[in-house]
Amino acid sequence: MKKILFFTVVLISGFSNAQDVRLLKGAITENVVVNDSLGETFSVYLPTYFDLSRPWPVLLVFDLEGKGKSALSMLSNAAEKEGFILASSDNTNDSLSISQNVLISNRMFNNMVSLVPIAKNQSYAAGFEGGAKFASILPTFIKEVKGVVSIGAPVGNIEILNPKSPFKFIGIVNRNDFNFREMEALRDVLDRLKFPNQLLVFDGEQLVPDQNTLASALRILTLNGMAKNEIVADPQFIQESFDMFLAKSNSFLSNGTPVLAEYLLSDMKRIFNPLMDLDSIKKTEKSLRRSSSYKQANRSQNNYFLKEDFTKEDYAYYLEEDILTYNYPNLGWWKYQMEELDKLDKSKVLYERQMASRLRGYINALVEDNIDFIAADKTVDVEALNFLYMLKTIIAPKDFDNYLKIISNSSRIEDYGTALFYLEELLKNGYTNKKQLYELPDTALFRITPEFNMVVEKYLKEARYEVIEQ
């Protein structure tokens, strides 16, 4: 049975407007009200062993689609293990300005401070992808936030970082992620700015890290607090943490990934300075770097980095040219490029497979950025948008929204041949939402053509011939 806390804000914060707040321990409490007049809410996770007798570290978790509970659920196991409170707003959104999102976050944070005892200098921010980019700029605006856990994304804006107010930055990234290269380069930038930082790198099919990696990031925040004398040092905790990270490094070696082992050993020197003597780590790292297995693996990875850089330059150049000239014939070249990446996915060479994954992520992000840029223009270039949507069907064939946009845009200019082609491609790829098809904007005339309904009947077994009222 879940344990339940029941207390009033006034008993903790002295607010004049008391409200009863019921927070679950070991589970996510949704729809906690920030401000009745603004209609803002957030979700909270408290560890099962939470009590009001001592202050706790808090991690503000951001998902810019406003899915607070979903964001918390991915970090709740790590928070349970490492003793962190989690809070996530339901109202932050990428459609809002940075200043609006900061104000929403600040109101949530202030509400958290009034509800539960928060440890001094132990308030942090975290996020996944877009949410991570926002989290990385939050310490600039909310001074109580002392660190960031950024999962799969670099710092949102390097220019606003203030060397006089550094915060802890912990990046977590898969080597398959196209952001990996940028996050790796970010370490040097943060070092120059004297921002303490680590980068936890992992491999695997899933771009989202496992729970142990997420828990490691939270543990590093605690160790950093001990190193700065903001948290009372616990020698047993420090030694257990050291042994845990060293065991992880050894597992990388035994699994044939010496580069990952070197990444972690390098970070251990940062994490445990000045908490303990680092001579053993320095010797281990030096020995690893001299080994033939590491030299060969590092050389191979760097060679693929170079090849990747050249390919990215080609992608950027040809995409710009194709957009400017509406170069539809070159869609065949892009299809060939994706087929080549598909072949590399089956390579026996790890670094080649990882390069293919990063390149696919890069071109997808590049196309998305161009779509956003063109769509935001006062005079939207519909033909350029249509080209990009067509390209998206090649690089992300299961993203059905792009097919629907092409069908709608093509029908608007009565290019029914193009609309029909992408209708069939859409259905070939497994799309089944007939209701949405018959309600697509600007397709009223197209939907009543025999050709449209024949294709629908071919793949969905039944067509609707009458005109549907809009």
Where do the PLM segments sit?
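Short beta-strand/loop motif that positions the catalytic acidic residue
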Residues: 169-174
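Short beta-strand element of the alpha/beta-hydrolase
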Residues: 53-65
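Gly/Ser-rich "nucleophile elbow"/oxyanion-hole loop immediately N-terminal to the catalytic nucleophile
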Residues: 48-55, 98-129
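Primarily recognizes the serine-hydrolase "nucleophile elbow" in alpha/beta-hydrolase
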Residues: 112-115, 120-166
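Short amphipathic alpha-helix adjacent to the substrate-entry channel of hydrolases
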Residues: 69-89
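C-terminal catalytic histidine-bearing segment of alpha/beta-hydrolase fold enzymes
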Residues: 196-269, 275, 282-289
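Alpha-helical adaptor scaffolds
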Residues: 351-428
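A domain-start/cap signature at the N-terminus of enzymes
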Residues: 17-55
